[in-house]
Amino acid sequence: MATSPKSTFVLGHRHLLGIEGLSTADITGLLDLSEEYVELNRQVDKKRTVLRGRTQVNLFFEASTRTQSSFELAGKRLGADVMNMSVSSSSIKKGETLIDTAVTLNAMHPDILVVRHHASGAVELLARKVDGSVINAGDGAHEHPTQALLDALTIRRNKGRIEGLVIAICGDVLHSRVARSNILLLNTMGARVRVVAPSTLLPPGIERMGVEVARDMREGLNGADIVMMLRLQRERMNGSFVPSSSEYFQYFGLDQKKLAYAKPDALVMHPGPMNRGVEIDSIVADGAQSLIREQVEMGVAVRMAVLEALARNLPNA
């Protein structure tokens, strides 16, 4: 069995509902604990027992492959009993409300609920109705805190720091919970954040979040240390936000020519799933400057760290 963690960090919050409200110390503590799990996950014995006897329920109202499987793996490696609740076959499909679902689940005494929902604020609402800890695995266009944490860990491991870096977040900022969480985290950690998108894909008043705004890739990528591409979320679009996928790629898709606008040692990220040929081409996505596969690896480590940090606050922990 693997050794106990060296970090004694305890997150001073019962839930992880977003990056908003986390301090620099909170973020740094989670990243430092995550580093231990990166090393653990590269060993033959990947098990710890910090969640032994605990029950983790993954409740996903939106389809997910990466996030749900990452949380499942994280919980099992920490010794938790993990249940994936199928929304498609649940009472929710039969008309049960979110609050009814929360009350029903709470009666089963889960220790940790990992929740993804299509509506912004739904996870926070559910958290008010349960006794255990709740982790937001993405709620509408609001937040996706563990994605921002894994992105920060990936950046820190490859650049040695976050503070002072120029980070360009490019694409469908309007519909992206990943963008919002990353902006909050990166600003807290002292990065210089720039969003790059056509006007139709920028939230009104985005400047108030403390970011620079660029509406073309040449300006947006100039001097960037990190280029973070976002998926074009057509499932959240009701109107014509972009003329066509091919035209979008022509102006805002990342290829080698546009990547050359950034610093020579710039690194490329994408939260996945990728639309190849829409927001990024395969040469860049699979190239030497890409961190996309590493982001997936960091995701398991970060989610293990979050689960452990919250578990330390549970009764009888």
From Swiss-Prot:
Carbamoyl phosphate binds at R66, T67, R116, H144, Q147, G272, P273. Pathway: Pyrimidine metabolism; UMP biosynthesis via de novo pathway; (S)-dihydroorotate from bicarbonate: step 2/3. GO terms for biological process: 'de novo' pyrimidine nucleobase biosynthetic process; 'de novo' UMP biosynthetic process; amino acid metabolic process. HAMAP family: Asp_carb_tr. Pfam families: OTCace, OTCace_N. Catalyzes the condensation of carbamoyl phosphate and aspartate to form carbamoyl aspartate and inorganic phosphate, the committed step in the de novo pyrimidine nucleotide biosynthesis pathway. Its EC number is 2.1.3.2. It comes from Bradyrhizobium sp. (strain ORS 278). This is Aspartate carbamoyltransferase catalytic subunit. The keyword Transmembrane helix does not apply.
